[in-house]
Amino acid sequence: MLGLIMTEYKPKRSRNIYSPNQEKPFKLSRSKVESFMKCERCFYLDRRLGINQVPGFPFNINSAVDELLKREFDQYRERAEPHPYMVDAGINAIPYQHEQLNKWRENFVGIQYFHEPSNLLLHGAIDDVWKSEEGELIVVDYKATSKKDKVNINAPWQRSYKRQMEFYQWLLRQNDFQVSNRGYFVYCNGKRNRDAFNEKVEFDVDLLPYDGNDDWVDTTIEKIVTCLNQDEIPNPDERCDQCKYNQEVIQYY
């Protein structure tokens, strides 16, 4: 007998829906800004009409790596010492100690900034922040994968990783921190060239530098507000798989 596969998807909600000219600030996460960048139509259906996007599957192994890296870097944070990864990479910095760090890392809280012209409360949960010898904050993002080739951030789909880092840099700057354009991806690549599993996966760890440019953020916020305030649903995006799927399915209704 086949087991029943249950889904947690709830297509329609009544909360966290944008209303034009609302007085209360509208909370918008970094991931929702990325959703707008990918498809204005799907974003509008979600944030303006309350039709949830279909969620992806959780990457629990990645989450475990993320949590363990945070604990590991926190040990060096407490001692105000650089992690050996940083020393080996020649990075003159230490993990940054700040009373709000745990909030900055917390999902649905994160670093927040109220953008008064748009009435948007923008936020994003970071993985880590380091502080350079010059006193600038360095945004750090943890990534985990398993591939035969050496990791890099050059694939077209990884542009979203770069925007993610740039958005965090922008949030910190809006909170009056001095932030370096250069951030780092702590990229963990699970090794496959072992004879057996033996209850563990070993990783190669690379620190990949990236020089961000957050100039796009303010312009994007303006476009988001314009999108949310319009009454017409944006046209389907030819780059969006969900839109393409919907366009095919609708022919049979």
Predicted regions and their residues:
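Mg2+/Mn2+-dependent nuclease catalytic core
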Residues: 106-219
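Short, polar/flexible loop-turn hinges at active-site or ligand-entry regions and domain interfaces
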Residues: 55-56, 152-156, 231
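Calmodulin-binding IQ motif helices
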Residues: 39, 168, 243
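Metal-dependent nuclease catalytic cores that hydrolyze phosphodiester bonds in DNA/RNA
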Residues: 2-136
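Short catalytic/ligand-binding loop motif for oxyanion handling, primarily in non-cytosolic enzymes
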Residues: 44-45, 52-54, 147-150, 191-195, ...
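Metal-dependent nuclease catalytic regions and adjoining charged, substrate-binding loops involved
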Residues: 6-9, 19-21, 27-28, 171-253
